[in-house]
Design a protein with these regions (language model features):
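Alpha-helical segment of the N-proximal tetratricopeptide repeat
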Residues: 9-47, 51, 58
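Residue-level recognition of tetratricopeptide repeat
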Residues: 12, 45-46, 79, 115, ...
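Structural signature of tandem alpha-helical TPR/SEL1-like repeats
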Residues: 25-35, 59-71, 93-108, 129-141, ...
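Structural marker of alpha-solenoid helical repeat scaffolds
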Residues: 41-42, 75, 109-111, 145
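TPR alpha-solenoid repeat register
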Residues: 48-49, 82, 116-118, 152
C-alpha cells in the first residue's frame, strides 16, 4: 500500500511529466528534458524514460534515446512504447535487421494502445528491403489498427500502385 508521502511524490512526478510533455510539444526540449529528469528522480516510470528518450530523438540523439527506452523496459517490461521506439531509432541508425525484433516485441506487450506504429514501422523496414508484399501486409495491419493513420494510408496506395 502506498504511503501518504509516496502518493504525494507520485502525484508531483505526474505533474512534472505532464509539464515536460507540454514543453516538448511546444519545442522547448531543454525544459522538457529537465522536467522529465525531475519526474524520474521522484518516481521512475516507464513512461518517463520513454518520453525522455523521445525527446532525445528530436535532437537526433538515437543512442541516448535507445538507452532511455531500455531503462523504461527495466521499469515496466509490459509497456509497449519503448519496444517500438527502439525499433524506430534503429531504423534511423540504418540497423533495420535489429529493428525487426523490437517491433515484434512491441506486438507482444500487453500495455500498449498503438499497435499501428510497430506495424507501420515494420512495413517501412520491409519496404526498404524490397519485400513489398510483407510491407503491404504490415501497412494494412497498421490501417486496420488505426484507419486514420495517414502514413499507412499513403504507403498502401503507393505499394498498390507499384503492383499495377
Amino acid at each position: 500500500m502506498e504511503t501518504e508521502g509516496e502518493r504525494v511524490r507520485r502525484e508531483r512526478a505526474e505533474e512534472l511529466f505532464a509539464e515536460a510533455h507540454r514543453q516538448q510539444m511546444a519545442g522547448d526540449l531543454a525544459a522538457a528534458k529537465r522536467l522529465y529528469r525531475e519526474s524520474l528522480e521522484m518516481c521512475p516510470t516507464a513512461e518517463g524514460h520513454t518520453f525522455l528518450g523521445w525527446t532525445y530523438s528530436f535532437e537526433g540523439r538515437w543512442e541516448d534515446a535507445i538507452a532511455e527506452c531500455l531503462r523504461a523496459i527495466e521499469v515496466d517490461p509490459t509497456f509497449g512504447n519503448p519496444y517500438n521506439d527502439i525499433g524506430a531509432y534503429l531504423i534511423e541508425l540504418d540497423r533495420e535487421d535489429e529493428a525487426i525484433e523490437w517491433f515484434k516485441k512491441a506486438f507482444e506487450a500487453p500495455r500498449y494502445e498503438s499497435y499501428c506504429f510497430p506495424h507501420f514501422n515494420l512495413g517501412r523496414v520491409y519496404e526498404k528491403k524490397g519485400m513489398f508484399e510483407k510491407a503491404l501486409a504490415e501497412y494494412r495491419a497498421a490501417q486496420k489498427e488505426n484507419p486514420q493513420h495517414r502514413g499507412a494510408q499513403s504507403a498502401v496506395k503507393r505499394l498498390q500502385a507499384m503492383k499495377n
